[in-house]
Each structure stands twice: as C-alpha cells, then as structure tokens.
Amino acid sequence: MAVGSTPKKPKQKRRSSDHRKHHNHDDDAATMASPAPPRSRGYGAYLRRCFSPPSALVVLCLFLLCVIWKRIPISRLPPPPRFYSFDVVNEFPHDPNAFTQGLLYGGNDTLFESTGLYSRSSLREVQVYHQMDGSLFGEGLTLLGERLFQVTWLENTGFIYDRYNFNKREKFTHQMHDGWGLATDGKVLFGSDGSSTLYQIDPLTLKVIKRVTVRYNDHEVPFLNELEYVNGEVWANIWQTDCIARISQEDGLVISWILLHGLRQGLLRSGHTAIDVLNGIAWDKEKNRLFVTGKLWPKLYEIKLRPVRGPSNGRIENLCPIRA
C-alpha cells in the first residue's frame, strides 16, 4: 500500500460488526435475566404457577375456617365468671334465735322469713309470727301472688299460706329429693334439695317440669340452699359457705360469685360467736335493694355489690368449697 493512501473500510466494517454482535449478546443476556410478562396465550401457565397446589390449599383452609367460625353459636359460649364483693348500706336488727332458712321481700318494706330447727320452726313477718308444728323443720320460702310457698327439711311436704294472715291454705307433696330452697320468677317455682340440681316446678300442679345441673368450671356445684330470683338469674346460698352463686336458669352455669365472708367475720369479731353460716337472700325489685342474713345472726344487712377481679386470698374453690 502506498504511503498516504487511506485504509480499506471492509476491515473497519468487520470490527463494527463484531462490536454490534457483542452488544447484542449483552442485551440478550439482560433480557434472559428479567422474564418478560406473560403473553395472552400464556396466561393459563402463569395462573397455574400462581395457584399451585400448596397455595390453593392454604386459601381453601382459610375459607373453611371462616365458614366454620360463622356457624359457631356464640351465644352458647359461657361468659367468663365474675366476682363481687359488697358494701353495707344499712343494718337492721334480726332475731338471733331465728335459724333462717328462707327470706324474701314482700313489698312495702316487709320481709317474710322461714326459720328452721325442730319445735322452733316458724313463718314470720315483722311483728307477725306463725308457730309451725314441732315435728316439722321449716326451709325455703317464696311468694307468688298472694300465696306463700314453703318446703320442709327431710320431708317431701310443703305448705301454701295466705300472705296476709298466714292461714294455711294447702298442704302439698313435691318431687324433689328434699326441701331446701324456693324462689320464683312470677311464672314458675325454682327449688333446691341440697344437691347440684336446680328444679323448675309448676305452681299449679306442683310437679317438676325441668331440671338443670348447676356447674362451674366443668364441675358440679352441690349444696344449693336458699334461693332468690334476681333480674333473670337464680341466686343460691351454698350450704356451709359464705358464698352466693349467680346461676343461669336456662343451662345451670354459674355466671358469677358473690363473696360475703366479711359479714360473718365482722360478727365474730364483735363477739357473736354463736352464729351459723350465711343463709337468706331477699331482693326488692322495685328499689333494687338486696338484703342478706344468716342462721342465728343478730343482724340483717342491706348491701350493694361491687365487682372485684377475683378472690383476694386464693382461688374460689378455697373460699367456696364447691366440690363434694
């Protein structure tokens, strides 16, 4: 090649072509590293990848759980038990010789009381007194209309009295194993016999129409004693304790506990050492007043409940031995 002549271009073209090939190779590699969005004809495969068997199974399980949860009858789940202590509103004198077995509010600041012990059992009102047969041991008492219903201990015998003059209207035989407590909602009678069974009794035929077993934390609650009906619940003294169980009349579950240990302890500290256990609940539904007393207690108390987190000195089973 002569001096000063220009270089041939084919060689440059070859170099440029090699450069383009190298550049295109890099682009292809980049394209392969980032998958292209699925084409319209490839959506089936794309969906199959998104909804693979494990993913579909998870979605199906979540759906079934939602369906099952919606079908659970939430109303049947028992509410968590609550606990109540008390404040004393008023104190009233009470016959210290009255072995209280039944107590109820009769309106117009009148209380009716049934007392026990052989030869000392009675049915009484303030300034009114009816001596019972000495062979009978008076127990639970309730008022329905103008009739006072009373049951007796170790007998399947009960009596119906006129509320105004205590004249005995009728003697009846009941179907409970024993006579301990009575209450009413104005339609049926509720009865207890010292077991864990809460009875419903027809006030006309005096036949048992329903039984439920009272339970707390999957355990039966025995020794149901004096009863009272309060705002849709049946309240029961638990024999030999200072506890009141608030019971659902429908299924027998204990809704909450009322802890009244302080009342008896206060009487003991005051020197009243002859007293027996708490027994006697009366509810004034017109004024929302609650009265309680005990066997051989010299005082009757009007109290107001206040909720507490739980028993202050141990489990409820330690304060209210509810297991037989």
Identify the function of each model-found stretch.
Residues E91-P96, Y129-S135, E170-M176, V212-E220, ...:
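Surface loop/turn motifs at the tips and blade-to-blade linkers of beta-strand repeat domains
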Residues T100, L224-E226, G271-W283:
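Signature of short aromatic-glycine-proline-rich micro-motifs recurring in repeat-based ectodomains
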Residues M1-R48:
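Short, low-complexity, Lys/Arg-enriched N-terminal segments of secretory-pathway carbohydrate enzymes
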Residues D162-F166, D202-L206, S248-G252, K304-V308:
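Short loop/turn segments that connect beta-strands within beta-propeller blades
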